[in-house]
């Protein structure tokens, strides 16, 4: 009985890497960018942020369309783990309906903004498609 149990545990442990989700490949040369506000801009809240994408298509979250994804806006943080789903919280905004702009409330002060393209499961592509970090000041 112990031998059988050890065998089952060993087989299960060996199968675990196969159960890990493989990251979606990004198209070569794909890019995302924040087109507004400009890096260094002084703005008032709420802030309208406009997104651009080249080399891939926008598709709603959950869509299994090749060479596609949807935007995630990181506010005052950087991508923690490119192999994990991007969380939805105050610092990570999901745009799973394939939106190309959003209005966000920001407190006065300096803030960083960065776009990351996520696949159908909100996981960054491989390689990661992300914008440069933009710094803005909210009056």
Can you annotate each of these PLM segments?
Residues 34-42:
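Short beta-strand segments of immunoglobulin-like
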Residues 1-4:
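Positively charged n-region of N-terminal signal peptides that target proteins for export
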Residues 16-20:
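Sec/Tat signal peptide C-region and signal peptidase I cleavage site
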Residues 29-31:
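Low-complexity, acidic Ser/Thr/Pro/Gly-rich terminal tails and inter-domain linkers that flank the onset
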Residues 21-25, 40, 46-54, 62-139:
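Long, low-complexity serine/threonine/glycine- and acidic-rich segments characteristic of extracellular
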Residues 6-15:
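Hydrophobic helical h-region of N-terminal Sec-dependent signal peptides
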